[in-house]
């Protein structure tokens, strides 16, 4: 039986046109949902505000607990979700004018083409069955409600432990951001189906592993499909937790999350408290990716760490350079511009407890958030109009990080008495850039290490206990292999 048909058989109704107020009208097609207990009449609004001072007022909105849906820094506008029965109001003398207001019936499900958690389960296992030499699927944890968290591993000789560098893609930290699942599933499908016919894809999968988590928050996704299409958090406790404010690094340290359980950016009772967060942390710690992209929506942005005010990563040439390069590969939905790159605090507002800051600080991953689609399309664009356009466009970004993983940099294996070791440390320092603090890389469990670098001369120091080896390398456009015996 069709999964979605069986789920909604008891209360389906025809698609509806949603009324417009103030300056615009919105049409949303979908399936009727059961009424949320928090939103009995189902009528929320998305308000577009024209801000007087974009950065300062974005900060005020975050600190005021408003649910920020998306923003356009270039036009100084921000979209706010205002729930039915909400007491929040907007003083135009403080925040600027409300230039658009759309009524959104949260009891209308997303377009039928988008995927439920059950459909994702079916799709990932079908892909593994169809391509057993390329694709493996594993459950890397369970949610509060007991759903499996699925990770897809795509590489040649998939059933062997290959010791290859890893690129990590993940989607749907936030439940209402349904287009992100499409991008993640498309990446897995594209790699598997093109391995036999595309020489570049073959090279990628022969030399690297691509790990993909298409749905970090399946409990929240289920709530989007059955109760509330604007639901953002997971479903633990009475109000849920924002999984992407729950990671331990800088948790509750820079006014980038909320301590109120009713807030859409509620960070949880403690750092790393959530099943989904713990599972993601364990997976990342095990696979130790070189790059990561977390797909979110919406606003057409490429974000990189750090996310608290005034903070930058030491490797700005690699991290920021990569973010800017990806942004140039992503045309806007309107076709007249590109995605905007930057840190969250520079473009939007401070964020604490996010996954990209934790990944970089803890495991030296080069991580990004890509905010898909424009403010015109929102969280749940027409599937037929925007799904293919979006996934095809975003391929350029995840393909960029795969290519970059296999280009300028250093990779090697550390051994002692001929055996690989996992407790060595590699420090790579530029011999050209004055004051370079370098990269400190922990060797993986299989004895390998990998660092993305810009071309130049580097000093490499490999240490384990009282044993140290120092080398000098010259990095050009290709990956340099340096195996070290201690």
Name every feature range the model reports, one short phrase each.
Residues 180-224:
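Short helix-loop-beta-strand segments that form the rim/entrance of peptidase-like active sites
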Residues 33-108, 424:
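Extreme N-terminal flexible tails
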Residues 465-486:
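Structured interaction patches on ligand/partner-binding surfaces of diverse proteins
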Residues 226-416:
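Metallocarboxypeptidase
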Residues 447, 456-466:
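A short, solvent-exposed beta-strand micro-motif common in secreted/extracellular proteins
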Residues 79, 136-141, 150-153, 166-170, ...:
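Structural recognition of the beta-strand scaffold that forms the well-ordered cores
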Residues 420, 428-454:
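Short, acidic Ser/Thr/Gly-rich low-complexity loop/linker segments typical of extracellular
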Residues 454-457, 478:
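A glycine-anchored, Pro-Gly-centered beta-turn/N-cap motif
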């Amino acid at each position: 039986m069709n999964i979605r048909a069986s789920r909604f058989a008891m209360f389906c109704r025809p698609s509806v046109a949603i009324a417009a107020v103030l300056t615009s009208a919105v049409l949303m097609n979908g399936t009727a949902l059961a009424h949320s207990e928090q939103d009995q009449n189902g009528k929320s609004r998305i308000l577009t505000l024209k801000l007087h001072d974009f950065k300062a007022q974005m900060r005020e909105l975050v600190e005021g607990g408003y649910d920020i849906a998306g923003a356009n820094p270039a036009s100084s506008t921000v979209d706010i979700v205002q729930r039915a029965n909400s007491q929040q109001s907007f003083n135009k003398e403080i925040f600027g004018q409300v230039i658009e207001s759309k009524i959104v019936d949260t009891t209308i499900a997303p377009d039928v083409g988008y995927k439920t958690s059950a459909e994702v389960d079916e799709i990932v296992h079908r892909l593994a069955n169809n391509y057993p030499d390329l694709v493996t699927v594993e459950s890397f944890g369970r949610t509060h409600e007991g759903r499996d968290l699925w990770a897809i591993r795509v590489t040649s000789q998939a059933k062997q432990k290959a010791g290859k560098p890893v690129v990590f893609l993940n989607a749907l930290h936030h439940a209402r951001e349904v287009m992100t699942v499409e991008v993640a599933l498309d990446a897995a499908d594209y790699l598997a189906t093109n391995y036999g016919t595309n020489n570049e894809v073959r090279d990628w999968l022969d030399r690297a592993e691509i790990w993909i988590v298409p749905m970090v928050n399946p409990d929240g996704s289920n709530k989007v499909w059955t109760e509330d299409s604007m639901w953002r958090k997971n479903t633990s406790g009475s109000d849920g937790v924002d999984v992407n404010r729950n990671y331990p690094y800088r948790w509750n340290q820079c006014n980038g999350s909320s301590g109120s359980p009713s807030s859409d950016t509620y960070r949880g009772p403690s750092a790393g408290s959530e099943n989904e967060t713990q599972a993601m942390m364990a997976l990342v710690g095990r696979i130790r990716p070189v790059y990561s992209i977390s797909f979110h929506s919406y606003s057409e942005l490429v974000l990189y760490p750090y996310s608290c005010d005034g903070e930058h990563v030491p490797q700005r040439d690699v991290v920021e350079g990569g973010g800017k390069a990806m942004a140039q590969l992503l045309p806007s939905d309107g076709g007249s511009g590109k995605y905007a790159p930057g840190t969250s605090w520079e473009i939007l507002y401070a964020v604490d407890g996010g996954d990209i800051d934790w990944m970089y600080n803890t495991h030296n991953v080069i991580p990004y958030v890509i905010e898909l689609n424009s403010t015109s399309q929102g969280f749940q664009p027409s599937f037929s109009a925007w799904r293919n356009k979006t996934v095809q466009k975003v391929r350029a970004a995840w393909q960029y990080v795969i290519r970059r993983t296999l280009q300028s940099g250093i990779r090697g294996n550390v051994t002692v008495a001929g055996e690989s070791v996992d407790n060595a440390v590699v420090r790579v320092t530029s011999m050209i850039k004055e004051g370079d603090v370098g990269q400190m890389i922990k060797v993986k469990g299989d004895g390998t290490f990998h660092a993305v670098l810009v071309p130049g001369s580097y000093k490499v120091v490999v240490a384990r206990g009282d044993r140290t080896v120092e080398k000098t390398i010259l990095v050009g456009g290709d990956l340099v292999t340096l195996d070290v015996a201690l």
